[in-house]
């Protein structure tokens, strides 16, 4: 019997899912269901990497509503309306949410 021995490093980051394409400049998320973004049905949404000023502006606009902060920020980073973000299916909104946090987190810490 020939079995491969797999050495899994528990500190290694999990691989990105197939629906997420990550770079230093942003993240592209493949939607499970095409959604209307800026009046056009699309199956992908791209979020560019944010700057601190943008995050703070969204937090100032919605100081007591974390979900509204996220929706405003995701819309700004994707260049779409908040309505477009809020009309995503929950599964796709969760993909965008996870992808955003994967984009802004530091891997090596």
Question: Residue spans of the language-model regions?
Answer:
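Short, surface-exposed, charged amphipathic helix/loop patches that serve as local interaction elements
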Residues: 2-109
């Amino acid at each position: 019997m020939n079995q491969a021995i797999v050495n899994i490093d528990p500190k290694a980051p999990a691989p990105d899912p197939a629906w997420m394409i990550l770079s230093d400049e942003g993240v592209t998320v493949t939607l499970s269901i095409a959604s209307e973004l800026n009046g056009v049905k699309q199956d992908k949404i791209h979020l560019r990497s944010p700057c601190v000023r943008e995050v703070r502006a969204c937090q100032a606009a919605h100081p007591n509503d974390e979900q509204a902060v996220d929706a405003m920020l995701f819309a700004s980073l994707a260049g779409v309306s908040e309505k477009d973000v809020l009309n995503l299916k929950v599964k796709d909104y969760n993909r965008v949410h996870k992808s955003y946090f994967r984009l802004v987190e530091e891997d090596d810490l």
